[in-house]
Amino acid sequence: MAQLSAQRRMKLMALQLLLWQSALWSGREAVPLVTVSALPPSLPLPRSFLLKSLEQVRKIQASGSVLLEQLCATYKLCHPEELVLLGHSLGIPKASLSGCSSQALQQTQCLSQLHSGLCLYQGLLQALSGISPALAPTLDLLQLDVANFATTIWQQMENLGVAPTVQPTQSAMPAFTSAFQRRAGGVLAISYLQGFLETARLALHHLA
């Protein structure tokens, strides 16, 4: 049993790495995010905001990992190559954080992309409603944590005076027509979210 658990974890790590790389480099498939037309000079971000954001990232990543392990163990949806192809067929969107890369870090654009991306993944998690009665509490908590993180980012943008006058509208979400699609879509959406959050975590460290 220990060997099977270790193999399952290795497959899960491979899935997250592959999908993270796909999310980072598939710019053409990324959902359009809010752009900021006029970028004022960057102001130092409060340490309290950075610490709170990093803690929220850690909490979401931990819940996401638990949910991925449960989906992998229960439904055997653990083969990266199959899931990536399924993601294309289901139209699972991914958010880009091009403005948050260490090579081209732009504070205002990064915050805007962070907020838009979190709203996207919040919508995806909502679309997964009914994935499994046993997983519903964890999924609901994950969705709430993502929404709270998005609020934290938006409030900081308002404090800096760089928030758009109107919050971005949510993109159309994929329509899952079967329990299998919803569960497979859950694995993909949460894996994309994990990669997104890892980029966000690195960016927040740079902004600090």
UniProtKB/Swiss-Prot annotation:
Disulfide bridges in this chain: C72-C78, C100-C110
Main localization, broad class: secreted
Protein name: Granulocyte colony-stimulating factor
Key word Cell division present: no
Subcellular location: Secreted
Stretch forming the signal peptide: 1-30
Cellular component, GO annotation: endocytic vesicle lumen; extracellular region; extracellular space
Superkingdom of the organism of origin: Eukaryota
GO MF terms held by the record: cytokine activity; enzyme binding; granulocyte colony-stimulating factor receptor binding; growth factor activity
Entry annotated with the keyword Glycoprotein: yes
Gene Ontology process terms (BP): granulocyte colony-stimulating factor signaling pathway; granulocyte differentiation; immune response; positive regulation of actin filament polymerization; positive regulation of myeloid cell differentiation; positive regulation of phosphatidylinositol 3-kinase/protein kinase B signal transduction; positive regulation of transcription by RNA polymerase II
Its job: Granulocyte/macrophage colony-stimulating factors are cytokines that act in hematopoiesis by controlling the production, differentiation, and function of 2 related white cell populations of the blood, the granulocytes and the monocytes-macrophages. This CSF induces granulocytes.
Similarity section: Belongs to the IL-6 superfamily.
Organism whose genome encodes this protein: Mus musculus
InterPro entries, sorted: 4_helix_cytokine-like_core, GCSF/MGF, IL-6/GCSF/MGF, IL6/GCSF/MGF_CS
Annotated glycan sites: T169
Subunit structure: Monomer.
